[in-house]
Swiss-Prot record:
Belongs to the NAD-dependent DNA ligase family. LigA subfamily. This is DNA ligase. The gene is ligA. HAMAP family: DNA_ligase_A. Its EC number is 6.5.1.2.
């Protein structure tokens, strides 16, 4: 039996890694999101039951759970040098002349590649397994970011050959992900990233790998730093990297001379704005590897390669009007409507104005002559006003008092920059809200990923979270990616979600400032969700850890007629809106527990919820105040610390006895044994 399980886990690991490669590297998926989710879920469950069979290249090992205190230093096996820059055709030809003098021949090729604007890293593999990854740092010493790099799905954890190799790549954030991230940060009043490079660097250097995983970074591998295999040319090396399973820079060109190389650079510049990732130039490299050794390098840069940098571009134009757009979380964003102007190869007729404070600070008015540039070469933005061309006919802009999409009230809290639509059913907000509603920490509807939600939303089958519970078999079965089996599975998952605890539903509603902890607090202090329609700010401020922003947000949300309508439809569909607090005992009130290792019958979250429902407190760290540590298979350092401190140890059998105890006295007896 155990050998069968081991083989099945290995089969799932290989299968999921294959589909990751097809999706993240080749951009050519072969299965639906739902089928992928089911494979992944099976693997997670098997690994939970049989932790001794967790393979190092398992896709579940991409996201670690531990938050680091800092990054260790790593000395690079081969220095990661930077490139010298050239800025025009003449300087490029000077580079070619110097290189020919250095190597004593003109009988060689160049390879021209994109200069990805990201963060350079080294990836080290031993016998085909990814063992270490580090940032460039100063070129000689970088930071160990192995766990964070594992979250990048285009980085293979196991190569297609059992080879030892060190490669260099550029981690970047795709343009669409950068835009999404900054929109989210703007809506949450967090500082914006200036460009995709900063976003990639900030994401990769997160101490918590789970945050890195959410940022959807990507990588292009562009060089072999060290390898057991002998290769003759750089082009050959790129093809070998592809063969091993790496994602390499697309559209590289082998050029016979510097003239062809410059033509290739011009073509790259022409299509720069059409690329899904950010580049700030092109790289020209000597193709013949043996001649690179002849050319050599300086302390900082190789003499056999150069970066051709593209210049930034700003243009003057007229601001014709200011249009207000509504984001997915309800924030109103002013957008400049411009007299069309060509910037960086594309016609720009709209540009961001960020927020009302930005407009006031820059004194931007409708009718002004303004300077526009592409922020990070992606997002057009108005950067300044040409005051010398102001005529006096310009108009001052003010934010609307009603949402331009749904007509609901627009509010602005005193301590915030953002203006917000309060409408629950505003179409501009609904899509993002639905994604949040179905997510794992909310209503946890299996198989309802982003592609499924997008399809249903675009078809008009769901406009609010409540619509999910009114979907019928005939609505789904003929849609793309659906069949009889997947339709039935999704409908079962939707049905199962109706019984989630009330705190899950409150969190799923996406109330501003109300996270999982606050949602649980609310659920513990009310009988049903109906109580929130009459609750006051004063009452909310009496709750543990509730501040003014949270109280105001809850009251505002539940005073909206659209909220009442949404809740009524959820109730009519059979979704649980009643608190479990009265049905639950408090036999473990005052006790504190810590969980470590894998339980065979319960996930970590399930065990935590059971204990909390009985009045217990569950913490992440062991101290002298801890009542007991519940230990599963393969426990961590918490088990050792509990033994050192003399804290009570409970196994899974003890845990089950404890949570089934009928009285506090019975629970105390179990804890005293």
């Amino acid at each position: 039996m155990s050998e069968f399980i081991r083989k099945r886990i290995r089969e799932l690991v290989d299968l999921i890694n294959y589909h990751d490669y097809k999706y993240y590297v080749e951009d050519n998926p072969e299965i639906s999101d739902y089928e992928y989710d089911m494979l992944y879920r099976e693997l997670v469950e098997l690994e939970k039951q049989y932790p001794e069979y967790v393979f190092p290249d398992s896709p579940t090992q991409r996201v670690g759970g531990k938050v680091k205190e800092g990054f260790k230093e790593v000395v690079h096996r081969v220095p990661l040098l930077s490139l010298s820059n050239v800025f025009n055709e003449g300087e490029l030809y000077d580079f070619d002349r110097r290189l020919k003098e250095l190597i004593g021949t003109s009988n060689f090729d160049y390879v021209v590649e994109y200069k990805i604007d990201g963060l350079s890293v080294a990836l080290e593999y031993e016998n085909g397994l990814f063992i270490r990854g580090a940032t460039r740092g100063d070129g000689n010493v970088g930071e160990d970011v192995t766990e964070n790099l594992k979250t990048i799905r285009s980085i293979p954890l196991r190569l297609k050959e059992d080879i030892s190799i060190v490669v260099r790549g550029e981690v970047f954030m795709p343009k669409d992900e950068f835009i999404k991230l900054n929109q989210e940060r703007e809506e949450n009043e967090e500082p914006l990233f200036a460009n995709p490079r900063n976003a990639a660097a900030g994401s990769l250097r997160q101490l918590d790998p789970k945050i890195t995983a959410q940022r959807k970074l990507d990588i292009f591998v562009f060089n072999i730093q060290w390898c057991e295999k002998e290769l003759e040319t750089h082009a050959q090396a790129l093809e070998f990297l592809k063969h091993l399973g790496f994602k390499v820079s697309p559209d590289y060109v082998v050029c016979r001379d510097i003239k062809e190389a410059f033509e290739a650079i011009k073509k790259i510049e022409e299509k720069r704005d059409l690329l899904p990732f950010e580049i700030d130039g092109a790289v020209v490299k000597l193709n013949q590897l043996r001649l690179r050794d002849v050319a050599g390098e300086t302390a900082k840069s190789p003499r056999w390669a150069v970066a051709y940098k593209f210049p930034p571009e700003k243009k003057e134009t007229k601001l014709l009007d200011i249009e207000v757009n509504v984001g997915r979380t309800g924030i109103l964003t002013p957008t400049a409507i411009l007299e069309p102007v060509r910037i960086s190869g594309s016609v720009v007729s709209r540009a961001t104005l960020h927020n009302m404070d930005y407009i006031r600070q820059k004194d931007i008015r409708i009718g002004d002559t303004v300077i526009v540039q592409k922020a990070a070469e992606i997002i057009p933005e108005v950067v300044e006003v040409v005051f010398s061309k102001r005529t006096g006919q310009e108009r001052i802009f003010e934010m609307p008092k009603k949402c331009p999409v749904c007509g609901a009230d627009v509010i602005k809290f005193e301590d915030e920059v953002a203006y917000r639509c309060t409408g629950v059913e505003c179409p501009a907000k609904s899509y993002r809200l639905i994604l949040h509603f179905v997510s794992r920490d909310a209503m946890d509807i299996a198989g309802m990923g982003e592609m499924v939600v997008k399809t249903l939303f675009e078809k008009g089958l769901i406009k609010t979270p409540a619509d999910i519970y009114y979907l019928k078999f005939e609505d789904l079965v003929n849609l793309e990616r659906f069949g009889v089996k997947s339709t039935n599975n999704l409908l079962k998952a939707i049905q199962a979600s109706k019984n989630r605890p009330l705190d899950r539903l409150i969190y799923a509603l996406g109330i501003r400032h109300i996270g999982q902890k606050a949602a649980k607090t609310l659920a513990e202090h009310i009988s049903s969700i109906d109580d929130l329609f009459t609750i006051t700010e004063e009452q909310l401020l009496c709750l543990p850890d509730f501040g003014e922003k949270m109280a105001k947000s809850v009251v505002t949300f539940f005073r909206q007629e659209q909220t009442r309508h949404l809740i009524e439809r959820l109730k009519a569909a059979g979704v649980n809106t009643v608190s479990e607090k009265k049905a639950k005992s408090d036999i473990l009130k005052g006790y504190t527990f810590v969980l470590t290792g894998a339980l065979s019958k319960y996930s970590r979250n399930e065990a935590k919820e059971i204990l909390e429902s009985l009045g217990a407190k569950v913490t992440e760290s062991v101290s002298k105040k801890t009542t007991a540590v519940i230990v599963g298979q393969d426990p961590g350092s918490k088990f050792t610390k509990a033994q050192q401190l003399g804290v009570k140890i409970l196994n899974e059998e003890d845990f089950e006895k404890l949570v089934k105890a009928l009285s506090r006295e019975e629970a105390e007896k179990i804890l005293m044994e």
